Amino acid sequence: MGVCMDARSELKGKRGLVRLLNATRYSLAGYKAAWQDEEAFRQICLLAVIGLPLACWLGRDWAESVLLAVPLVLCLLVELLNSAIENVVDRISLEWHPLAKKAKDMGSAAQFTAQLFLAVVWGGYLLGRLWA
């Protein structure tokens, strides 16, 4: 346990540019892990690669483009958090437990909610443009 605390203390002592560079490196490692291990993350990235330029093209101004982009980015964020929850639960134990199921189900529900939000925003926007 002392090793973990020493490592944590060493990381907490970093400040300024060193801390920022370390945080960036950890974030990039997180993206890499999600890309390699999570099919859902890759699917949402593909959706974002298509949807973000489409949002810029469809939006009549900056605000409309952002309105369409936010749900796409939200889905990416929620998938990263959902994957993190799943990994932590699996790290603790691979055995079935009602609390583990609850945590994973809640993460899944968060992603489902983000995807519903995406569908409502894009669907409403596109229908509004069709009937305008």
Across the structure, where does each feature detected by a protein language model lie?
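Hydrophobic alpha-helical transmembrane segments
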Residues: G2-A84, I92, W96-P98, S108-A132
